[in-house]
Amino acid sequence: MALVKTETQALGNHQHSSRFGSLYVGDLSPDVTEKDLIDKFSLNVPVVSVHLCRNSVTGKSMCYAYINFDSPFSASNAMTRLNHSDLKGKAMRIMWSQRDLAYRRRTRTGFANLYVKNLDSSITSSCLERMFCPFGSILSCKVVEENGQSKGFGFVQFDTEQSAVSARSALHGSMVYGKKLFVAKFINKDERAAMAGNQDSTNVYVKNLIETVTDDCLHTLFSQYGTVSSVVVMRDGMGRSRGFGFVNFCNPENAKKAMESLCGLQLGSKKLFVGKALKKDERREMLKQKFSDNFIAKPNMRWSNLYVKNLSESMNETRLREIFGCYGQIVSAKVMCHENGRSKGFGFVCFSNCEESKQAKRYLNGFLVDGKPIVVRVAERKEDRIKRLQQYFQAQPRQYTQAPSAPSPAQPVLSYVSSSYGCFQPFQVGTSYYYMGNQVPQMSGHQNITTYVPAGKVPLKERRSMHLVYKHPAYPVAKRGAKQTLVFKGEVNRNLEAATCSKATTSEENRKEERRLTLSGKLSPEVKVEESGKQLQ
């Protein structure tokens, strides 16, 4: 994609179109605010205003801004001093702002704009500008980056078409840091789409290249079929060949002749594949159609293609073939990789028949490779996988969320007593079952029953007090002297009357028991049965 175009000449060489100095500042970090820009630009020159463009809906920064100065001279000084300097980790791209709509429309067509590729990873936007500035006034210069790393190409826009032509003639094919520069006129998106739709394409795709093949080797091989305008072997972040490249001819007939002659040629240990270069979307659609046709023509193919995941980052196709090769003849093996050549952690292995793939799946599923257990499954088309998942979820019974009903109360029974302690530890008032956590929520309308527990330890034979409790193996035991409170979980409408009668009966029996023990001398007057003041709600 082209750079955002600037619209005026640099001050000193050309007259600025506005009486005020206005600069466009692009490639900003999303975290940059208006205050950051003011602090950065107002160190040596006065800033009149700053406008950071934001999304009208989300309010997020669009990563570019306009800064107005009191004069074009101040703006020129700021651009000279701060262009390509860092602000919150990203290099700013500064250029003159232009309000002339006609000029802006013309720059969108690629006016005086150059596309530069085969750049060394050490070349920055500032280095690229110094390389091209001897040929004229530069409006915009940028090396395209991803995650802070150069992608090996960039754009340079001059103020005149003549300057762009001079730079292209002088620098195209020159060696910079051991790489041959490719400099060409920038072609906008619409023109590229029209060229891609042309069946007589001049761009050729070459794969199955051995690691030692360079751009010069590829140029020598293909130039015997016609004039070659550009050659590139794609490489990862470490500079290693990714095994494929592109060759562009000046004549479509020469490109067609090269494809017919070189496809299948043995180059080193591999056979070349040479075909028409396609856009990523076109290639994906073609492979999708080819895969679907194979499934229709060869139903058994679906069982011979395996999906392998949980692969290490160092996994490559050669190792994948070595691992699966002992179980049969491998038709193809592919490890899906990022642009830097690192494995995405999954891949595909296709065998010549389904019996071989079944054997490989049986013995290699869960097999440790580089310390990781790999997962081997039968590969599915995306449509089949979506359909299978939909059928699975439709077959599951629907679960409706509703308020839980009150649990049926257990029947109250005589409480038994531990041999070590005098009573059970009851649940706290207003809580749910202690041993069930939050599984049984407290329901409104449930009754809280306070029971009567002796304050001290009494002989085992005298422990005959009645308590309304629920049997449960995890029911905790209280220490001696503890005050007991029991939550009776029951339905009000069904058990209110029974609970009231039980409480009255229990209270009366405890008073009689206290009186009898006191008179008989078995219970001291200080030890009393304590009744909570908590009444039935």
Swiss-Prot record:
Name of the featured protein: Polyadenylate-binding protein 6
BP-aspect Gene Ontology terms: mRNA metabolic process; regulation of translation; translational initiation
UniProt GO molecular function: RNA binding
Subcellular location: Cytoplasm; Nucleus
Listed GO CC annotations: cytoplasm; nucleus
Keywords assigned: Cytoplasm, Nucleus, Repeat, RNA-binding, Translation regulation
Biased composition (Basic and acidic residues): 506-517, 525-537
Coiled coil: none
Tissue localization of expression: Expressed at low levels in leaves and young seedlings.
Sequence segments annotated as region (Disordered): 503-537
Note: A.thaliana contains 8 PABP genes.
UniProt family annotation: Belongs to the polyadenylate-binding protein type-1 family.
Top-rank lineage group of the source organism: Eukaryota
